[in-house]
Amino acid sequence: GIDVPEKYGGSEMTKTGMCILAEGISFCGSPSFCTVWNVQTSIGSLGIIWYGNDEQKKKWLPGICSGEKIAAFGLTEPEAGSDATNSKTTGVLSDDGKHYIVNGQKIFISNGAWADTFIVALKIDGKFSSIVIEKGTPGFDIGKEEKKMGMEGSSTVPLYFTDCKVPVENLLGNVGDGAGPAFCGLNIGRFKLGASAIGGMMLGMQHAVEYAKSRKAFGQSISDFGSIQDKLATSAILTYTLDSTCYSVIGKQTEAINELDKNDPEYYVKQGNTTEQYIAENSIVKVYGSEAAEELIDHCFQIYGGYGFIEEYPMAQAYRDNRINKIWEGTNEINRMLCGRAMITKALSGEIGFKEYLEKVDVYCNNGLDSGYEGDLKTEVECVEAAKAVYAICLNESLSKHGQDIGTEQVIIENLANILIYAYVGDSTLSRVIQNKDLYVQKNQVVPELCAKVYTAEQGIRVMEYANKILNSIYDGEIPKELESKFAKLS
């Protein structure tokens, strides 16, 4: 009940508290339990918290909060995965107006075999809607447990609806309001996935460090070898940068929520809608978190050598369990599309002052970067500012070439998202290090600053690679000299 109001049995924890809890639960070492918890506290219940009426909240939330009831979420279908609004599951109002007759199928439903309540996306009168269906409802059948390569302690099943009679009072909001319960919950689910990765990454590093210290080769601990130290250093950088990004993102969302009036009858609806403003940021956390965890696990696996491949050691399970994180809560490809398109929308609407920033970029290219920061990390700050400038140039060139059709240019959108991810992670990390510099000096902690320096240096090179892919796509390999000159000044 971390997001549930106290009156319905929850704790209504702060969003920062939620992030800390996600990190702590994942450090316990059971990704399957993290999955159950994440579904229970995000996609399985947020739709009710934010968009349910008082009677619906009283009926379902106390049991979900106490754990007496398990929650699940039904969105994916055999013919509607990433294109979720293409749902073939339908609800038709009964002749007496008391029920929706639901027909259709859902697949890959986490918590499905155990759940008591299911938030189900469907079409009613051709309009995308969300409804709560309870276990045991006539016409509702739960399929067999899927045999998975990982997350074996979690439940994943198909759901079948055959003339399933669901009371009309189970509809969340009105007919056609399905996007809120479905996608706003997914936004927070994506964030929690990234936040949960932090604890798992810390645990993986702990295992790898302990093993490296104890494992002897050539008469010494393998932790003394440069190649092993490089893997551990990279793992530390990945963990610190993800941690910085998560708390930066949740801090911004908390600020937006704090501006809402708690006495407003629509407070929780508006809180849910607030997540729409942070689609890009939550997608960044999900993509970077799942991919950072994957890279870290691979390094830790390698440190274990042959033992990494043996099930009684910790890295084999971690390797299997993590793979799904790049797929569920929206594939990383889709999240890159969401991230890229969200920023394009903000640029075209004038929300982020894109035209004004382009003028600033021209000044950068003529007179050099000026971040306004004069501290020890000036080079790193300017590296991130250069990445932002490169992003702006690439976005402007993409819009000039493709106009309103830019949304269909997936290679361009994906690489724009890659630049944006680097810039956001780099900015979050540097902001944290600069803000806490006195504390780090006092405690003689040098690792945070080193993490920031290495991350910005390595990713800065990749930014130019992403930019070249974008411009080569636009100009068929013949990039104008003017743009090459701009990039040379920013690189």
Q: Which role does the model predict for each range below?
A:
Residues 2-58, 62, 66-67, 110-114, ...:
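Internal helix-loop-helix
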Residues 79-82, 108-111, 123, 148-155:
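Short Gly/Pro-enriched turn/cap motifs at secondary-structure boundaries
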Residues 89-93:
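A structural signal for short hydrophobic beta-strand segments in well-ordered beta-sheet cores
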Residues 98-142:
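A short core secondary-structure module
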Residues 109, 151, 272-363, 451-491:
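Alpha-helix capping/hinge segments and adjacent helical runs
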Residues 141-243, 283, 324-328, 332-337, ...:
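Glycine-rich beta->alpha junctions and the first turn(s) of the following alpha-helix
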Residues 209-210, 231-270, 417-438:
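Loop-to-helix element that buttresses phosphate recognition and phosphoryl-transfer chemistry
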Residues 364-491:
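C-terminal amphipathic alpha-helical interaction region
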